[in-house]
Structure formats: structure tokens, C-alpha cells
Amino acid sequence: MTGLDELRFASGTLIEGKWHKQHYRLIKWLGSGAQGTVYLGRSSTRTVAIKLAKDRESLISEVNVLKRFGELQGHSLGPSLYDHDDWLIKGKIISFCAMEFLDGVPLSEALKRKPFDWAVVYVLQLLTQLQQLHHIGFVFGDLKPENLILMDPGHTVRCLDFGGATKLGRSVREYTEFYDRGYWGIGGRRAEPSYDLFACVMILYYAALGKRIERSGNPEQQLIQLAKTEPMLIPFQRVIVNTVKGRYTEAAQMRRDLLQDMMTNKRNEQQRPVQNVQRKRAKTNKESWKSAWLTASILLTAYILFVIIYVM
């Protein structure tokens, strides 16, 4: 095992793979986590993200997940894996992998700037991708906005770090308390789809409240009450309560209900101006009523197109 301080190298450092003999030059440090340090790098042909591992076994687990995703057609949850090897430096061996460099904005930053509707769209995208991950036998584990990136250009959510990915049935070892159902006393840390789904709901709480909150003496009731009283969460309280209570066993189930509630909420929002005009029709001419109805119809149609582009 290698300490994180031992994984900090100067820009321009050249890495040579022990087995595959590929060369990579480190351009700049991108970040460090519990299991390693990531650099922007360059191979002979392209820009890459290079992860130097603190623990070889953890890296092997992450590489195996990325390989499985590479076998799926049209997957888009994580980065493409280009290479994984060992680097011999000063008598020590550091395991590393070279991956697709994902250029964008961390979801944790995007959620602070975007309207709440976007948070729902991002979670819908995430649920589609989690369905694929669960299908091949893994849960994400440490699912949180900091481990997700919003691609630029476009509004596609991708994952930056599969270090916490865990095989179904095993115990999740890497987690962040706020997004962990074990912390909230609402289920254990067994790797199953519902573990990731709970984290998705907590992303909605974070987006709606603008911060992480502390648990109370009755955490389950605390979360349910928030879903019923927080204005931005109220339209989605059915999905939130079902998830908190562990009623969804597949990401596709949660996604179906969340999409339905999002469309219903948007339809209701667009109908309110028309209803206001109808209540005042004694004071309003027929043409203005038609205008309000037409405007609402156009807005609803535009929103449906938006959903098709970014969600479906």
C-alpha cells in the first residue's frame, strides 16, 4: 500500500508501464481521494486521466468494473479504460490505470447554479445508467455529486470514480455519510440496488436544500417530513418516500415514477396561468384566454422536447 503523499509527482514526470511498455507524461494534478491520486496526462496519441493507486486491490476492482462497462453497447456511466499497468519507480511499484479524460463541471458545483428541475433530470439520467451497472452485478457504493461530472458540452452526467463499486451481495466499504442509508439508520450497507437508489434521493435533498443536513433522533421520519414540506420536494414525495422505505428494487422502477411525477408537475405548472385566466374570464376577452392557452401549450411542448433530448 502506498501513502497519498507518495503519489504526488511534478508536472512533466514520465511514467512507463512495466508490462505494456506504454509511456505517459503527467501534465497536472487533478485530485486525490481515499484510494489514489488522479492526474491529467498525455500518451503518445491522446489526453488521458491517469489514476495512481494507493491500494492495488482497490484499483483492480475498479478496473474490472470499467472493463465490464466496456463490453456493453452504448454505455456512458464511466470513463473508457485505455490501459492498466504497474510503474516501477525508486524501487517501489505503483499500480495505475489510464482512462478517458472527462471534461466538464463537477455535479456538486452544477447543482448550486442550476434550477432544481435540472437536478431531477440529472438523477433520471443517473438511474438509467445505474440500471446497467446493477445488471452487470455491481452497485456504485460511494454515490455523491462529487463523484459525478456534468460533461461539457451538453448536459450528460458521467462518473469520475468507480473506486467504491462493490459486487452485489458484498458489504459497501466506501461511502459518504450523508448519502449512506446506514448513517441514516434506514437499512444496512449490503450492496444491492436499493443502496444506490437511496443515494439518488439524497442528491435531490442536497439540491433542494442547498446543503447536507444532520440526522435527527428519528431519521426516517425526518426525511419523510422534509419530502412533504419542502416546496421543491413535494411534487416528488411519492418517489422519495418509496425510496426511503426501500420499496424500489430496481433503478428502472424509481426512474419510471420520477419521470411521471416530473411531467405531471410540469403540466400542472403550465396549466395554472390558464386557470387564472379562466377565473377572470368575466374581465378578460376571448382572445387573451386563447393566448394564455397557446402559451401554456407551447411551454409544455418545449418541456417535453427538453425531456426527450436530455432524459430519454
Predicted stretch roles:
Residues 248-268:
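Terminal C-lobe "cap" of eukaryotic-type protein kinase domains
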Residues 122-123:
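Activation segment signature within eukaryotic-like protein kinase domains
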Residues 23, 27, 34-63:
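ATP-binding glycine-rich loop module of kinase domains
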Residues 133-151:
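Catalytic-loop of the protein kinase fold
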Residues 266-312:
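C-terminal single-pass membrane-anchor helix
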Residues 79-95:
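Short beta-strand micro-motifs within the conserved protein kinase catalytic domain, predominantly
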Residues 90-106:
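Conserved short submotifs of the Hanks-type protein kinase catalytic core
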Residues 230-244:
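Conserved C-terminal C-lobe helix
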